[in-house]
Amino acid sequence: MKRWDRGGRPQFNEFNITEHAESTDHPDDIWNTIHNQVIQAVKDVSNRYMEEVGCQQQWPYSNALEQVRLKHYQVDQNDRFDEHADVGDHASARRFLAMFFYLNDVEKGGETKFEHRSIKPVQGRCLAFPPMWMFPHSGAAPITEDKYIIGTYLHYV
């Protein structure tokens, strides 16, 4: 795990699942298995998103998945991610859909907050949203238990 501690912009531990899966020679490695499961989940969530939003005709024909990352927000470190947009420079401008897969319930705190909505972390759920400047959000510090998510982005190719 790599520690990010920029005083809330961001502040959490991160493990790059894609990097690890691509660096192993063992196809039955647990991280390869997890990586493949996440890829399938991204496809399923993308299809549901297109149906619910009604954007099948506008969906980018050519797209790819950014690296898959496990993020750990610790209660005792006041880990959080203050308000930001996930597209903020040329390198991130190809992102068009963010996905956060919640791996555990957090009783208090840990919400992903948008201007008019707050999403509570619930195990097994996925939050998908456009990562552009029109959707600034924050990751509140968990209060009762650590928060674990797997995050990735779909991007243009």
List each model region and its residues.
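Fe(II)/2-oxoglutarate oxygenase catalytic core
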Residues: 1-126, 134-157
